[in-house]
Amino acid sequence: MENGKKKKILIALIVIVILIAGVIFWKRKNQQKTASTPAQTINLSASSEISSLDISKIDDRNSFNQVDNVDEGLFRYDKNGVPHKALATKVKISKDQTVYTIDIRHDAKWSNGDPVTAEDFVYSWQRAVDPKTASPYTYLFSDIKNADEINQGKKAVSQLGVKASGKYQLKIQLNKPQSYFKMVLARETLYPLDKKVVKKYGKAYGTSSKKTVYNGPFINTGWTGTNDSWKLKKNPYYWDKKVVKLQTINFQVIKQPSTAYNLYQTGKLDLMPVVGEQAKQLENNQDLVKRPLAATEYLQYNMSKVKALGNKNIRLGISLAINRSQLVKTILKNGSTPADGLVPAGMSKNPKTGEDFAKEAAVKNTANYDPKLAKQLFAKGLKEEGLKNLQVTLLAANDDTTKQIAEYLQSVLSKNLPQLKLSVSTIPFTVMISDVDNKKYDLNLISWSADFADPITFLQLFTSNSSENSSGWSNAEYDQAINDSNNKDANNQQARWNDLVKAAKVLASDQGITTLYKSNSEDLVKPHLKGVVFNGINGHYSYRTAYVK
C-alpha cells in the first residue's frame, strides 16, 4: 500500500517537473521570438501641419499624403503612378468609352463598422461638385456628365453622372471618352464618404481625428486640428488588413532640416526628407534614396489685388531677374532643376515624336537669367502703369527650406530690380494656403505636384474659371486651347497634345506665373524600413505594405 502511495507521489512529482519545464521552455521561446521580432512602429516627420482630413476640402500635399494612408478609393497608384484596383473588383467600359460600370468589393468597411457601398461614392462626388462645398479639386470631375454645370450652380447635384445601380455597383456617365479617367479615379477627392458621419459633424467633419471616419489601411489618432503631432494606427476594419504590417506610425511636424537630421541620427526618425545644405553633405550617405518627382515650384501673382502685377512686362522682368541655376545649386542642392515652364520635364512625351513636353513647350527669353533685359522690361512696365517703383510682399510657408528660397528671391530681385521693393512674410503652411485661397497676398511662393501623369493636371489650374486660379490671370487663347483639348480634340491624341503645348506656351509667354524649378525628392531611409511605396508623380508615400525588418 505504501509502495503504491510512493509510486503515485513520484509520478505526480514527475508530471509537475515536466509541466514547470514546459512553461519555462515556452516562456524562453516566446521571449526569443519577441526579441527577434521587431516592433512594427516607425517615426516620421512631416514638413507641415495637416490642413484637413476631409477629402473634399484638402488642397496640400501633406494632407493628401495622410489621407492616402487612412482612406481608399476605387483604384490606388503604384510607384510609377499607374492605377490598380483597390475597392474596385471589376470594371466594364462601354464601346463608346463613356459609361463605366464598376463593381465594388463587398468586404470593405469603414472604421466604425459601416459597409462601404456604391452610395458612399455617389454622396462623396455629389458633395465635392456642390458649389456650397467649395472643393478646390472640382476640375477632377469635369469629365463626368453635368459636373461643371453643377459646380457653376446651373444644375442640381442629383444630376451628376454617377449612380448606384446596386449596393455594390457604381455606374459613371462621362461627357466624352477620356483616356486618363482611371488615373482620375485613383485621386483622393474621388474617394467615398460615409454620409452618416459627415452629416453628424457637418462643417466640422475632417477637422480632427475624432470627427473623421476611415476606410483605409490606417486610422488617424491624436490630431486635434491644430497640433503638430499625431499617429496612424492599423485599421482593424480594413478589408486587406493582412498585408498591413505596421501597427503604429508616429508623425511629428519638423520644419528645420537640422532638427530632423539630429533625430534621424539618434534613431528617433526612420525616414526624413533631405534638402538644402544637407543634400550636399549627405550625398554619399548609404541611407540616401533619390527619386524623381513631377512637381514644379513657382511664383504666383495676385493681379486682382496688385494692379501693376497685371502688367506682362513687370512679370517678365521679375522672371528674367531670377537665376534659377544658382537657386537649385546653392539653396536646394538636391537634384532639383530649373523649370522653363509649368509642366515638369520627364512626365509626358509627344505621342508621335517622343519629345518631352517641357522641351517642346519651352519659350525663349521667359525663364532664362538676363538681368539687363529684366531691368529694362520692369522699368518699361512701371512706366506703363504710371509708377516709379513697386512695393509688394512675397508670401511663403515658414519651413526652413521655403524660407531660404524666399530670402534668395528677395536678395536676387532686390539686386537686379532696384525699382522693386520686395518684403517677405513667412507663415504656417495651412494659414498660407487659406490666405492664397482668399486672395490675401501679393506674390506667393507655391508648388504643384501632378495629380496624374498628364500635362492637363498642371495646365487646368490656370483657366479663367479654375477654382485653383486665385491670381486673376485670364487669357482667352489659353482657355480656348484647354477647352479644345478637353472637348473637340479629346479623342485625337496628337491634336490634344498640340492644344496643351499651345496653352503651355501662352502661359509662359504671358508669364501668367513665373516657374522656378522642377522638384526632386531625396530621403534618408533607415535600412530596417522596407516596403514604403513612393509615387513619383504626386510625391505621396504609401505605408500600406511597409514594415520593419
Give the location of each predicted region:
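Extracytoplasmic/peripheral linker and loop segments enriched in polar/acidic and small residues
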Residues: 15, 419-432, 460-526, 549
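Structural transition elements
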Residues: 338-380, 401-403
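Gly/Pro-rich hinge or "lid" segments in bacterial periplasmic/extracellular proteins
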Residues: 174-244, 248, 258
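Long beta-strand-rich cores associated with HINT superfamily self-processing modules
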Residues: 523-549
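Surface-exposed binding/hinge segments that line
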Residues: 137-196
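Ligand-site clamp/hinge motif
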Residues: 236-280
